[in-house]
Each structure stands twice: as structure tokens, then as C-alpha cells.
């Protein structure tokens, strides 16, 4: 999402404008600079296969961005909807914001409830089928999301349907995981 990133000042102005109109801002929360550092670290270590993808985007990358967007929303007086939430740590930040009285919402996806990081341990290039962002996480994050769902803390579940053909698309990253188109199918047709 490098071409979609905003400076915090621009994000604040946009969120403030949406808030003035009574709107809600949806936020994909990953710190792009930290992701770039993670990708560079994986490359420097010679890790270029799809199994390196989750290591380039550890849970803290999501949590930092969730905290930042919650702060921007609070300062701007605009509710935020954190989309594709995948970690317990990010969920705890949302809980803290809600405890302060901040209006914020959470969306997660079936893949974060049902799949985990073991999908990145498949033989050969098969793990490329599971390259998405945020990446699949450790099982304890899945369990935390299920608990939050049962407690009514997750407001929506969305598919984030973003499918790519394995042959001809996902294969673009055969030599470099950072070139694999991110996304998995979320709708059967």
C-alpha cells in the first residue's frame, strides 16, 4: 500500500473533515515504514520466500498503527473503524480507547478467526496462497478474536475478498515474497 500512505498531518486533516460531516473513517492499520524495514531485514537475511511475509509485518506493526489511528480519530473528533484487525495487542488498544469513551469500531475477517501462521509453513511456494496483509497470526490471536467476537467487541466481520490467481499472479513473487500480490479469496462463487 505504499502508494496509499498518508503523512499523519494529512490523515488528521482528512479525518477531521470527515468528523465535521458526521462520518466514520475506515483504517487499514499497518505502519508502512516499519513494514519496509521488516521487508529489508528479511531480504538482508536472505529470506525471500512466502514464509518470510509474516516476519516482515509482526503484530507490533499493526498495534502501532491502531494506536496512532485511534489517537488521530480522538483528536479529530471522528469515530474510526479499524478494519482487518488480527492481533490481541491491537484489540487491547481498542478496549482502552472504548474505556475512555472513544467511539471506535472493529472489523475482523474469517481468515483471522480460522487460519493461523501455520499456513506459512507449507512446502514449496504453496504458502504464497496465504500472503495477505495483515498476515495470518499465531493461534493465540485467533483465540483472542473469537473471545472478543463472543463478547460483542467486534462490530463486523468482512471478507476483505481480494483474490489473485496462483498461476500468473501470486507467482510474480516466486523470487521475492514482497512481490506476491497480497490477498486471498473470501467469497465463494
Functional labels for PLM-detected ranges:
Residues 168-170:
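Cytochrome P450 core scaffold surrounding the K-helix E-X-X-R motif
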Residues 160:
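Short phosphate-coordinating micro-motif centered on Lys-Gly-acidic
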Residues 62, 175-189:
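Gly/Ser/Thr-rich active-site loops/lids in small-molecule metabolic enzymes
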Residues 3-157, 173:
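Histidine/acidic residue-rich metal-binding segments in metalloenzymes
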